[in-house]
Amino acid sequence: MFKVIKKQGRARRGQFQCAHGGMVQTPVFMNVGTQAAIKGGIDAFDLRDQLGCQIELSNTYHLHLRPGDETVKALGGLHKFMRWDGPILTDSGGFQVFSLASLRKIKEEGVTFASHLDGHRIFMGPEESMRIQSNLGSDIAMAFDECVENPAPYDYAKASCERTLRWLERCKAEHDRLNSLPDTVNPQQMLFGINQGAVFHDVRVKHMQQIAKIDCDGFAIGGLAVGEPTEVMYEIIDAVEPYMPADKPRYLMGVGTPSNIIEGVARGVDFFDCVMPARNARHGKLFTWQGTMNIKNAQYKLDDGPIDPQCDCPVCRKFSRAYLRHLFTAQEMLGMRLAVMHNLYFYNKLTERIRQALDADEFDAFRAEYSRKLAEKV
């Protein structure tokens, strides 16, 4: 299922087999299509044919509310619904539920919260999250967990991790049951557990040791990139990584910048996701191999060159900086679409180049050249 084929330091070059789309090459960036679509007018055919996407990520909470997971199941599952034949990971809905701080109530059974759409009350617990994700038919389901706010009191973070551990045990039991049903959409669906613990190293390590005993198909580090300093995030990864099973994929949830990805790989992480490339693109902020740029700046008004001379994406091959700036200035929808295409291609190409560097035993040199450079402004 998952195999590490090469290492350089803690950085891992691997392969991961999914029910859809064949072998995933890792490290990998997962393109975030929250509601079975990437904001900016990007469809499954763009992802597959033009942007180099290996895995798409969709959101359990949003799809449960609209169009409804039962609807998606009736239409053959998420792959058929969005016409994507590659792997899909669905998050558990936990992050969205717990971000509704003023609208939810936590109990041992699960969480009662108000829909952000119309305010009606919804209950979601481990079993409900597993059933929704089973209906969606994703390749990878994420366990239902509590993502505590930052900063969080030590005692609360500790108690929350104990509850999240119990929830993972319930997720595992329900997930196994659902996969055995004759009418399940994807009987090969996998389950990843999630490490929590806020910024407290001892809580994080103990929780990782506990969840590693449960037979999950992979493990994630959650609850980061929520306001803590970048160095604190790296320190937490350093603390937790030694206790993550070496034979299972490791996923750093919601992270991050290109530099974060390079540094995450250096610390033994295999999977990444983030809304940043698409979100930034919709505001004219683009990633290049020279650093970040704001295409709306006046300096690009007469610039006939590509966004990035070192990029071979469909946008850089065809359009100029001046044209893209004009589209944003004129508020044309095409501007957002082209910008999102470029940024997603860049992120997918970044992880491809990381894999190539690992294959060639040149990751340390790649990291030294690009980790700081990609964070600079052009």
Language-model features, listed with the residues they occupy:
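C-terminal extensions of enzymes
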Residues: 1-15, 24-31, 40-41, 145-151, ...
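A non-catalytic, amphipathic alpha-helix used as a structural packing/dimerization or gating element
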Residues: 128, 132, 136, 159-170, ...
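Short, well-ordered coil loops that connect the C-terminus of an alpha-helix to the N-terminus
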Residues: 53, 84, 138, 216-217, ...
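Non-catalytic, usually N-terminal nucleic-acid engagement modules in DNA/RNA processing proteins
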Residues: 1-185, 298-301
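Structural signal for hydrophobic packing residues in well-ordered secondary-structure cores
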Residues: 137, 168, 172-175, 179, ...
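Glycine- and acidic
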Residues: 150-153, 158, 218-224, 333-336
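Conserved, mostly hydrophobic/aromatic
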Residues: 22, 56, 91, 133, ...
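Glycine-rich phosphate/ribose-binding loops and adjacent secondary-structure elements
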Residues: 162-165, 174, 178, 186, ...
